[in-house]
Regions:
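Alpha-helical transmembrane segments of multi-pass membrane proteins
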Residues: 2-271
């Protein structure tokens, strides 16, 4: 093997490692965003999540049970309409983003432009870009109500933000990174502790990735809570700005043209 070939192989490997590291940091950022979203949703929008659908299903059951005329241990559950609005918005976001991704993939395949080994595909950035419209709508409505939305507006806000979170979840799913969804930590716990039970040692990259998600979710939740306390009008701006940053960074950092694919070796990369 020539010296040039060795140098090229090393450069390709460096590109791949660098791309994976950047991808993980972008996933951390999206997790911070969803942590802030759920904190603001739960506190300010009637104890309903915009991203964590497992919690909403439990809340829906509580709300239905409360229709019998009593509360569970004195806890007042959220309104059924609010929970259903969030669930419908999230489902709609997943459906919309998945349709966008599939159409993009089919179009690329028809043109024989579907790259392989891409750490962050273009369709993920596209879906996240469109989710910004839902974020923007939420921010505008929030500003219009001076951070104090009424009962009739809350379901609209929940559906809007859940739409954005559903699109984010579907976009991240395209990356096929084990244990990472950015909108909940349940899968991360399953992946982490399940592998420990099987005595399969995690790599340093896996440790960093999983730890980053858990820490980022806590950071986002804390930041969202602090904003609600000290500057409630700007609380939804944080996830909006973070998502913009992720979209811009991904669009600039990951190239998808043939020349870029050739420079990266066009080699499939394990998550």
């Amino acid at each position: 093997m020539s010296t040039n070939s060795v140098t090229t192989a090393v450069e390709k490997a460096d590109h791949q490692v660098s791309d994976v590291t950047l991808r993980n940091r972008l996933l951390d950022a999206l997790t911070v965003s969803s942590g802030a979203v759920d904190t603001v949703s739960f506190i300010a929008l009637g104890k309903v999540f915009s991203a964590f659908m497992t919690g909403n299903i439990a809340f829906l059951g509580m709300a239905i049970a409360s229709t019998t005329g009593s509360t569970t241990y004195g806890v007042v559950p959220p309104r059924v309409i609010s929970v259903l609005a969030a669930m419908a918005g999230f489902a709609g976001g997943i459906y919309l983003a998945t349709k966008i991704v599939r159409r993009f993939e089919q179009s690329a395949a028809n043109k024989n432009q579907q790259p392989t080994g891409v750490v962050w595909p273009r369709q993920t950035t596209l879906a996240l870009s469109i989710s910004l419209l839902a974020h923007l709508c939420f921010v505008l409505i929030w500003f219009a109500t001076s951070a104090r939305p009424g009962g009739s507006v809350i379901p609209v806000l929940l559906a809007t933000w859940a739409l954005a979170m559903g699109m984010q979840s579907a976009a991240v799913r395209q990356l096929d990174v084990p244990g990472i969804f950015t909108t909940a930590a349940t899968a991360t716990f399953i992946f982490l502790f399940g592998d420990w039970a099987y005595n399969r040692p995690l790599t340093s990259e896996e440790h960093s990735r999983l730890r980053g998600v858990l820490v980022s979710l806590a950071i986002g939740a804390t930041a969202g809570g602090l904003l609600l306390i000290h500057a409630p009008i700007y609380a939804p701006v944080l996830p909006f700005v973070i998502t913009i940053g992720v979209v811009v960074t991904a669009a600039r950092a990951f190239r998808y043209d043939d020349e870029a694919q050739e420079s990266r070796g066009n080699v499939p990369l394990a998550a």
